[in-house]
């Protein structure tokens, strides 16, 4: 195919929609190629250069995916922190055990809830530090002095897969902990934390 117009439709057919766990605000489709005679493909760029160009694009996308995972983790942390400050459960401990004469305390004063909140905070702040460092390396690789730029590019090449994979795994764990802090409410659509988990689950899969 030389790119000239023939008046005929290319044999690419929209076969249906994929019904996803998360990211329901974006459409994801299934395409069939060449089932009725053959689809025509067009070369973009030079022969043998496609994979190199794709990886150049994907390396930038990986940092973006890691940042997206981090922000979803942070959103869950902020939601569960606010909930833990507001949700009363249990009585304060006195010398003889729980003091039934005292008002209930917010669950943020429970040791296990504190643990889950601090774990979320640690995962998300660590992930954010990594993403911002990679963003700085991108700038330095493009604008630094030749030796500094080369060193930044080399370090970025090593860190980019980590900047994608680590936040997408551990900020998803943060989202799971955010659901746990909410208890049964976290499993309902009345609170946003279940959606944060569903949306963040994709970041371990896609790029």
Task: Give, region by region, the residue ranges found by the protein language model.
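Internal glycine-rich alpha/beta core junctions
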Residues: 1-207
């Amino acid at each position: 195919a030389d790119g000239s117009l023939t008046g005929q439709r290319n044999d690419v057919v929209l076969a249906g929609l994929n019904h996803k766990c998360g990211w329901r605000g974006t459409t994801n489709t299934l395409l069939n190629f060449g089932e009725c005679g053959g689809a025509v493909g067009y070369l973009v760029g030079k022969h043998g250069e496609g994979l190199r160009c794709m990886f150049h694009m994907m390396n930038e996308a990986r940092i973006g995916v890691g940042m997206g995972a981090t922000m979803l983790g942070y959103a869950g942390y902020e939601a569960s922190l606010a909930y833990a400050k507001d949700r009363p459960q249990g009585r304060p401990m006195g010398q003889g055990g729980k003091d039934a004469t005292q008002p209930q305390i917010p669950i943020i004063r429970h040791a296990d809830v504190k643990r889950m909140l601090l774990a979320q905070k640690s995962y998300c702040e660590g992930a954010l530090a990594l993403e911002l460092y990679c963003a700085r390396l991108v700038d330095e690789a493009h604008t630094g002095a030749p030796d500094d730029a080369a060193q930044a590019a080399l370090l970025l090449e090593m860190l980019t897969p980590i900047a994608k994979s680590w936040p997408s795994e551990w900020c998803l764990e943060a989202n799971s902990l955010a659901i746990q802090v909410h208890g049964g409410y976290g499993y309902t659509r009345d609170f946003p934390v279940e959606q944060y988990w569903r949306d963040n689950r994709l970041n371990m899969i896609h790029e």
